Amino acid sequence: AETKCPYLPPHEWALDFPHLMLRAKAQNFENKDTKWRDRIITSTDPIFDAISTPGIAQMANAAANSKPLRKAGQALFGIHQDAPLPTFIPKPLTESLEGYIGDHAQVTSSEKTTGKVAIFVTCYGDHNEPQMVEDLIAVLNHNGVPVKILQDAKCCGMPKLELGDLKKVEKMKDANIPVFQQAIAEGYDIIAPIPSCVLMYKQELPLMFPGHTDVANVKAHFFDPFEYL
């Protein structure tokens, strides 16, 4: 069964509680009432890019599995010693994959889709779980769907949204929307393997920028992998 806030529209109270809490987070951020730790760990683009390099990735992974260092991290930064941390790869996936994969396949469009997919690999797919993206590509190619890898996209902005840093969310939106629009203009639909990243472009950004035609166009061409298949 679906679980959600019971007072969302069309309820007579029309209370969007999740976004009410988001407004509170944004106010806290504006008042500088957020931890520096949270400001750092939500800066995924510079942090992940710095770690996903030969030597550094291996050191970060070793540190994440070191009990003494995890205890120190809990004491210094408030990151629980038993909290799972992502494993980093020494080279981002977007630097390893070809730009176009399976482009020999015959394109078959449908009523809602073009039959070609541009994959927004996301921070997690690019730096932590590349196999997830590679498996998605294999499934799409198996079903006759040619794939393009979006090379220049930034973080979707969900970590900064949860922090309440709405200006940074807008900056990331401004960086990604042109990349997505270019792919759409070339006849591609957009897919991301991480549900929260899909949610940003299907729901959160359209709510934040209701009059933005490019955001609306990206929303119309953005799909969850299972929805697309």
Map each language-model feature to its residues.
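Short functional micro-motifs and their immediate structural scaffolds
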Residues: P10
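Iron-sulfur cluster-binding electron-transfer modules in prokaryotic oxidoreductases
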Residues: L15-L229
